[in-house]
């Protein structure tokens, strides 16, 4: 016996096409839209009681496809991948950190198996018959004794090809504090002893870098001016690479030490006044001006509360200096340091323009190299016209910037 109630009858059977495999919803469209439970049937109880049109639509699966990953899963996989990469780079940097690199010996830059004689000369060389007579090959033929040891790009080991990611990673500092690295070395006390340790190849802190263009004294060490300036440049790099210079004392100490080294370099008779040594001094002055700009900007703007807590306390005996007085003292110190910088620039300008002929034993080689590159360019006092003009322009630009900085500091 079939029931006469319309809501107890089953919905008509539908035969969807085999192409889409869609199924009907268990709730009618009206109940689905109102988000209420549907009794089923055609029509359902709710549509019958309210006189609605009861229709059943196909299911609409709008979710992600099967096998897709959500954001949390992707972030977790990325984090695991980055942790693995970091561990690999840390192991690689730890292995490379204990190496004693000597630039004068190119074999130290590649692993020892890479320089096996049979493998180097037989396995990694192109046959001479395959070399085309191009202009580049003609240049290579002029230095056959050097090109015989050069490998082909296809023959390079995986070790040498994978150095790119390691070289591009930022250098991790051993300490977040600026006090961890060496402060500038003065010319008093044990500065020269420490500098001799820096140049000693037997010590673990030395990498055996050759120092050309530096005049050696009786013990075989370069002049203390050049060595101290190199240490100052390393310290200035540490200070200028930070986001902001929050240590006024370290900045002033580095600037003062570098300016004193510049003045001693100009008047020192043992120093070699070559192009390389003068460019080293100009590089130090370039880094000094970066600190000058930071100090000038910090003096002109108001310090936020978190920076005021890091200010170094200042006192004169039992008298404690206030914040305004401490700022005035800073301005005076910056102004005096800018004046010292102007004196150092003037002394360096006089050295470039009116220096005598400072040429060491390597001078004839440098002069012949200049003559081969610029045959018609005269050499004046050990410096070419191009070198002298370039240095003069650099010093002039720094003098102009110095005038602006001195006008910006109010005393």
From Swiss-Prot:
CDD domains: GAL4. One of its GO terms (cellular component) is nucleus. The keyword DNA damage does not apply. Signal peptide: none annotated. The keyword DNA-binding applies. Residues 28-54 bind DNA. Residues 1-17 have a biased composition (Polar residues). InterPro entries: Stress_Response_Reg (IPR051711), Zn2-C6_fun-type_DNA-bd_sf (IPR036864), Zn2Cys6_DnaBD (IPR001138). Gene3D superfamilies: Zn(2)-C6 fungal-type DNA-binding domain (4.10.240.10). It holds the Pfam family Zn_clus. It comes from the Eukaryota. It is found in: Nucleus. GO terms for molecular function: DNA-binding transcription factor activity, RNA polymerase II-specific; sequence-specific DNA binding; zinc ion binding. Residues 1-21 are annotated as: Disordered. Keywords: DNA-binding, Metal-binding, Nucleus, Transcription, Transcription regulation, Virulence. Induction: The expression of the hexadehydro-astechrome cluster is induced by glucose. Expression is positively regulated by the global regulator for secondary metabolite gene expression laeA and is strongly induced in conidia during neutrophil exposure. PANTHER family: THIAMINE REPRESSIBLE GENES REGULATORY PROTEIN THI5 (PTHR47540), TRANSCRIPTION FACTOR RGLT (PTHR47540:SF4). Transcription factor; part of the gene cluster that mediates the biosynthesis of hexadehydro-astechrome (HAS), a tryptophan-derived iron(III)-complex that acts as a virulence factor in infected mice. Positively regulates the expression of the HAS biosynthetic genes. This is C6 finger domain transcription factor hasA. It comes from Aspergillus fumigatus (strain CBS 144.89 / FGSC A1163 / CEA10) (Neosartorya fumigata).
């Amino acid at each position: 016996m079939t029931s006469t109630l319309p809501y107890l009858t089953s919905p008509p059977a539908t035969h969807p096409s085999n192409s889409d495999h869609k199924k009907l919803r268990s709730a009618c469209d009206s109940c689905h839209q109102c988000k209420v439970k549907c009794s089923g049937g055609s029509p359902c109880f709710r549509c019958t009681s309210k006189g609605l049109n009861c229709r059943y639509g196909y299911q609409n699966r709008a979710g992600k496809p099967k096998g897709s990953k959500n954001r949390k899963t992707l972030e977790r996989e990325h984090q695991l991948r980055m942790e693995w990469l970091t561990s690999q780079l840390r192991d690689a940097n730890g292995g490379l950190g204990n190496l004693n690199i000597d630039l004068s010996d190119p074999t130290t830059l590649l692993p020892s198996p890479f320089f096996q004689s049979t493998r180097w000369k037989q396995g990694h060389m192109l046959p001479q018959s395959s070399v085309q007579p191009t202009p580049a090959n003609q240049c290579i033929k002029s230095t056959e004794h050097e090109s015989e040891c050069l490998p082909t790009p296809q023959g390079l080991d995986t070790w040498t090809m994978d150095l790119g990611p390691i070289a591009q990673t930022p250098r991790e500092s051993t300490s977040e504090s600026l006090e961890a690295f060496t402060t500038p070395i003065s010319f008093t006390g044990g500065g020269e002893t420490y500098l001799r340790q820096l140049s000693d190849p037997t010590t673990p802190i030395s990498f055996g870098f050759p120092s050309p263009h530096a005049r050696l004294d009786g013990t075989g060490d370069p002049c203390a001016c050049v060595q101290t300036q190199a240490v100052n440049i390393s310290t200035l790099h540490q200070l200028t690479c930070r986001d902001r210079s929050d240590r006024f004392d370290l900045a002033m100490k580095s600037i003062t030490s570098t300016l004193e080294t510049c003045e001693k370099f100009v008047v020192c008779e043992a120093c070699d006044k070559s192009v390389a040594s003068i460019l080293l001094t100009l590089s130090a002055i370039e880094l000094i001006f970066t600190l000058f700009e930071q100090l000038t900007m910090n003096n002109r703007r108001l310090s936020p509360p978190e920076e005021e807590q890091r200010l170094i306390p200042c006192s004169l005996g039992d008298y404690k200096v206030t914040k305004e007085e401490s700022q005035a003292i800073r301005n005076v110190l910056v102004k005096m340091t800018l004046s010292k910088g102007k004196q150092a620039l003037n002394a360096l300008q006089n050295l470039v323009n009116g220096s005598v002929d400072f040429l060491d034993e390597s001078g004839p080689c440098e002069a012949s190299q200049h003559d081969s590159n610029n045959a018609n360019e005269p050499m004046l006092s050990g410096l070419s016209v191009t070198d002298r003009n370039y240095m003069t322009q650099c010093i002039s630009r720094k003098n102009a910037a110095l005038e602006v900085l001195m006008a910006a500091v109010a005393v």
